């Protein structure tokens, strides 16, 4: 049954293999009277042309197209006709999960696991996500390759013990690629929160390990954060900094987001004080704004990604409005800004 419309049409192109799979997906979308499928294709070149011709509000891309067609379609759409892209991935294994992360780096806004059967709950989540990202103004992604970095461990520096906390949401993986590749030799632990469906977090960590200039791992409860290493919040779990650089994890629903940027930043403010360095990247909503303000009030350095380089300026803008941002920087200046902040803490 199609539900009543609210007057705002979301024009959508579906890029998926032909047959029952694509038909089922389109049927699920059409249950929302406001979502209109204006194009469909199982071929990358044809999909790229359809998007350029129809100028949809959202493109849905399944990652199971033959060869590397899905990735190629995403890269070319974002380079030629920037459009909010939702990717669907089936059963996640060691091959598929990194593909989802690469798609996010290429410019896709969101990723959802594709179920074998669309339950009412999963169908509602799909339609809700389509409507949400349809409102996002996306930026052009002219490059398709992953950034490379040379991995090296950093020695513990003299002076205070700085701690870097980075948080991102929509558009975050691409921004993280740029930043992490520029952190070679950083003499501080780096704690990362990325809003992402739980099923994709392991793939994110694996991919980050390949593009980062520093070793990357999933954070574990009670481990000590070491300088020159990057710790990523597990899926569906808050990451906090405790005393003596001890990491704390919990799944208590204290925020709409789990992991939460506010939870991470607030804990860094409490535990590191003026040695805390907060970095807020692209994303929808306002998660992280209050936590970043807490770091600044304790004397720490707070950086945020500027509007021009953000896929979505919501989170940095919310922090700026609160007066939480020490310095607003373009993406390519954030890694140097982090190095500078660490040296400032240690001086």
Each predicted region: which residue ranges?
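Conserved acid/base catalytic micro-environments in cytosolic active-site loops
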Residues: 1-36, 40-347
């Amino acid at each position: 049954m199609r539900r009543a419309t609210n007057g705002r049409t979301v024009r959508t192109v579906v890029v998926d293999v032909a047959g029952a799979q694509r038909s089922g997906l389109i049927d699920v979308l059409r249950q929302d009277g406001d979502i209109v499928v204006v194009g469909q294709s199982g071929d990358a070149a044809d999909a790229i042309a359809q998007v350029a011709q129809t100028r949809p509000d959202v493109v849905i891309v399944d990652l199971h197209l033959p060869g590397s067609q899905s990735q190629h379609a995403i890269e070319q759409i974002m380079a030629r006709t920037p459009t909010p892209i939702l990717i669907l991935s089936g059963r996640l294994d060691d091959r598929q999960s990194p593909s989802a992360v690469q798609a996010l780096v290429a410019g896709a806004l969101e990723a959802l696991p594709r179920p074998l059967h669309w339950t009412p709950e999963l169908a509602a989540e799909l339609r809700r996500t389509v409507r949400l990202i349809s409102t996002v103004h996306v930026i052009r992604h002219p490059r398709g390759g992953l950034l490379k970095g040379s991995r090296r461990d950093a020695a513990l520096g003299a002076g205070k013990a700085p701690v870097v906390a980075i948080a991102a949401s929509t558009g975050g993986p691409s921004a993280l690629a740029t930043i992490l590749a520029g952190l070679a030799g950083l003499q501080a632990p780096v704690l990362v929160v990325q809003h992402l469906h739980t099923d994709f977090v392991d793939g994110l960590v694996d991919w980050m390990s390949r593009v980062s200039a520093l070793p990357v791992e999933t954070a574990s409860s009670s481990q000590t954060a070491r300088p020159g290493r990057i710790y990523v919040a597990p899926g569906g779990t808050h990451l906090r900094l405790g005393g003596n650089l001890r990491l704390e994890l919990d799944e208590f629903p204290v925020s709409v987001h789990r992991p939460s940027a506010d939870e991470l930043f607030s804990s860094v403010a409490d535990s590191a004080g003026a040695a805390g360095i907060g970095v807020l990247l692209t994303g929808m909503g306002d998660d992280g704004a209050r936590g970043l303000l807490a770091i600044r009030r304790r004397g720490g350095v707070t950086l945020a990604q500027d509007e021009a380089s953000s896929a979505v300026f919501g989170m940095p803008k919310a922090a700026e409005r609160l007066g939480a941002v020490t310095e607003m920087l373009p993406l390519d200046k954030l890694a140097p800004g982090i190095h500078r902040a660490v040296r400032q803490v240690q001086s």
